[in-house]
């Protein structure tokens, strides 16, 4: 039997952490701390198992495909031997913290004009689990799977030419998809009936803030591996959702 690589072992661990985090949030309904109350479609245990299954099979499966394709494209592996722990953990944490501060400042600037005021955040400590799930799950879908898949597919069509340009184009599309992917939850949270009800200023804010984080995550994933991308996202959310969320409650 072929021995699992360190990168694959870490990936499996990340998927299991995602599954546990999602299951815990579903079982204890932590999202109701900041979302409008709604009747559960199934018992909490069923929801927890369903969320864990989605994380393992859907997220895990798509991420595994992306993991294999990223290796073919020359992206850094999750546990690339040439990547230092400083590049893999420390620098992404610092970048994430800076991005979190940037989101806070932007929130204060945009809030008088975006029609909803300041963004609401999950209550502590559920905000930590939300940060874990976003840092792993959203990065698996929008970075680890989306970018390598489309770069690989287009590279076949172009026979390997202009791969760097293709990477940046796909990264921008991924960033836009990631930003717009927040609109459905935003509509539920603030009671918008359609996308047309959302203020253009708010849409610009969402695209700008999420887009910057997405582009940084894409670059660091290719250069230093998936852990770097997940780290940027996770530490951004820790500052933005956890620390700023607590500060807003206190202040």
PLM features: what roles do these ranges have?
Residues 46-59, 202-207:
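Alpha-helical transmembrane segments of polytopic membrane proteins
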Residues 125-251:
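Transmembrane helix-loop-helix hairpins at the membrane interface
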Residues 14-34, 63, 67, 103-109:
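Alpha-helical transmembrane segments of multi-pass membrane proteins
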Residues 38-39, 45-46, 70-137, 151-161:
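Juxtamembrane helix-loop-helix connectors linking adjacent transmembrane helices
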Residues 31-41, 114-121, 192-205, 251:
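Membrane-interfacial helical/loop segments at transmembrane boundaries in membrane proteins
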Residues 61-73, 146-149:
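Membrane-water interface of transmembrane alpha-helices
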Residues 1-15, 48-52, 83-94, 227-232:
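Alpha-helical transmembrane segments and their helix-start/interface "positive-inside/aromatic belt" motifs
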Residues 8-22, 92-99, 171-177:
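Alpha-helical transmembrane segments
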């Amino acid at each position: 039997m072929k021995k699992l690589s360190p990168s694959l072992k870490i990936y499996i661990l990340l998927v299991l952490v995602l599954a546990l985090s999602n299951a815990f949030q579903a079982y204890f309904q932590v999202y109701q701390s900041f979302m409008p109350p709604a009747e559960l479609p199934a018992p909490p245990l069923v929801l927890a198992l369903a969320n864990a299954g989605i994380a393992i099979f859907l997220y895990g499966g798509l991420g595994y495909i992306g993991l294999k394709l990223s290796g073919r494209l020359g992206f850094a592996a999750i546990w690339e031997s040439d990547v230092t722990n400083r590049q893999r953990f420390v620098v992404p944490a610092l970048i994430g913290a800076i991005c979190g501060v940037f989101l806070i400042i932007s929130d204060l600037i945009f809030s008088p004009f975006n029609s909803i005021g300041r963004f609401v955040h999950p209550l502590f400590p559920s905000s930590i689990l939300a940060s874990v799930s976003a840092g792993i799950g959203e990065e698996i879908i929008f970075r680890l799977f989306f970018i390598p898949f489309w770069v690989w597919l287009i590279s076949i069509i172009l026979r390997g030419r202009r791969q760097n340009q293709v990477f940046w184009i796909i990264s921008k599309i991924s960033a836009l998809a990631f930003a717009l992917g927040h609109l459905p939850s935003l509509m539920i949270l603030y009671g918008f009936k359609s996308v047309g009800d959302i203020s253009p200023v708010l849409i610009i804010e969402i695209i700008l803030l999420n887009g910057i984080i997405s582009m940084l995550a894409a670059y660091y994933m290719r250069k230093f591996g998936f852990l770097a991308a997940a780290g940027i996202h996770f530490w951004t959310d820790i500052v933005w959702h956890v620390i700023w969320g607590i500060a807003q409650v206190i202040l």
